[in-house]
Design a protein with these regions (language model features):
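Eukaryotic intrinsically disordered, low-complexity regulatory linkers and tails enriched in Ser/Thr/Pro
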Residues: 1-65
């Protein structure tokens, strides 16, 4: 399954196969804003907002057991 993800830091939109998402973790900045850092199979890290992550998290956990 393919999803479009916009990197919060660079503003670049990536088209990502969710099977390539290897790892993700939550970060909260000093202002209390939540972001998720997604690590792909090629070690590329993409920072996404909580809103973006909530749209794809069920798909990721369903396919990446």
């Amino acid at each position: 399954m393919i999803v479009n993800i916009i990197d919060l830091l660079t503003g670049v939109e990536y088209t990502v196969n969710i099977l390539h998402i290897c790892y993700f973790h939550k970060r909260v900045n000093e202002f209390g804003k939540t972001a998720y850092i997604i690590t792909l199979s090629n070690n590329k890290e993409i920072v996404v907002t909580h809103k973006q992550w909530s749209k794809i998290k069920n798909k990721v956990t369903m396919y990446n057991v």
